[in-house]
Amino acid sequence: MSSSRRSTIILENLRKNQIRELIVSGKRLDGRSPDELRPLNIEIGVIKKANGSAWVKLGNTEVVAGVKVETGEPFEGLENKGALIVSAEVLPTAASYIEPGPPDEETIELARVVDRGVRESEMLALDKLALIPGKIVYTIFVDCSIINMGGNLFDATSYAVVLALATSKIPVFEVKDEKVVDTCLLYTSDAADD
């Protein structure tokens, strides 16, 4: 057995012992009690050129989400619904083990889970976002940047996405002669439910 592998095993055993001791003493690794929540801080409107945005700090995890609304073609099989696309990026400064480059499998999974949570909650009435059914729909992009990773990444990212969407100002597009025209008018996402 190599010395690096032996060191890893020793560290894993020490960590297990530390966790056992913390459980017995009624504490978590970060010093919180078992029923104590991580502190939550939020700020909305942090990206001025986005249709909506939010910054969330949950414990030591920080996430920024920005919303951009455009028009585009509907997804196949969903011709009469608007499109939602959630993407995520973990900045290399978020944790010591993060490498620069394209998103890894875990980051892609994070974006998919958050995307699915928004869709299946039906917080967005995607069926009301078809401008020309089968041809042109609202396309809502939500880009998430993970600034710091300190646990509970799925919750922090979900909070940021929901806040960014809930506070978005959506452009109003008009249909003239089977074409979409940007009217430059904005309304808040609350109006989408009316």
Provide a role label for each language-model segment:
Residues 92-98, 145-152:
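A generic structural motif
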Residues 133-141:
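Short, conserved phosphate-binding/catalytic loop or strand-edge motifs used
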